[in-house]
Regions:
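N-terminal beta1-alpha1 cap of cysteine-dependent amidohydrolase-like domains
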Residues: 1-86, 90-92, 102-127, 131-133, ...
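A glycine-rich, often tryptophan-bearing local segment used as a flexible ligand/cofactor-contacting loop or short
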Residues: 94-98
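Active-site-proximal beta-strand elements of phosphoester/diester hydrolases
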Residues: 170-175
Length: 183
């Protein structure tokens, strides 16, 4: 059974964290938890036992986000960034900042909101489609990504997916796939 490290953000509710936990377990994974208040030594110890990291959604780039991305990239672990986690991946190593979207079309509490169009990518290979509808909970966006390649955008040009083209699974998505399991 593969072990995946899940960063528990202190601003996330128990319900929000439960979605991530259930998704990992549903697909046969075991969850190793760290908190965004844990020491760097504790985080390094936890990273020794996992094959991948899930960077979840949240409201701000946390103090451990870039530390985890540094470790994952240098040790070639699997990485899935969701919502804020993807934004952290996109901003990693750059001086770029998050931009306010300015409308509510990307923040709806339920259902599928807009489509995402994928370029030639691993994510497209995994999903087996070029375009599909996603949920959307974000108020901010990134314009580009410094290290990871942009592979998906919404019809209005918002970056929705990024990946490391040189690694089999280092992917960030702006939507919440863990919540799509209930639709």
């Amino acid at each position: 059974m593969a072990k995946f490290l899940l960063l528990l953000r202190s601003e996330n509710t128990e319900k929000e964290n439960r979605f991530y936990i259930q998704a990992i377990q549903r697909f046969g994974g075991e969850v190793v938890f760290i908190s965004d208040t844990d020491s760097y030594d504790d985080v390094l110890h936890a990273l020794d036992s996992v094959s991948g990291v899930l960077l979840p959604g949240g409201y701000n780039v946390g103090r451990l986000d870039y530390f985890l991305i540094d470790y994952v990239v240098s040790h070639q672990l699997k990485l899935l960034g969701i919502c804020q986690g993807m934004q952290s991946m996109a901003l990693w190593g750059s001086s770029h900042q998050l931009i306010s979207i300015g409308n509510s079309s990307h923040h709806q509490e339920e259902g599928y909101v807009h489509s995402v169009i994928l370029e030639n990518s691993r994510l497209q290979d995994i999903l087996g489609v070029h375009s599909f509808y996603v949920n959307s909970y974000h108020y901010q966006k990134v314009l580009d990504s410094y290290y990871f390649r942009v592979v998906g955008k919404s019809s209005d040009g918002v970056v929705e997916a990024i990946e490391d083209s040189n690694h089999s699974f280092q992917i960030g998505v702006q939507w919440h796939p863990e919540r799509m399991l209930e639709y």
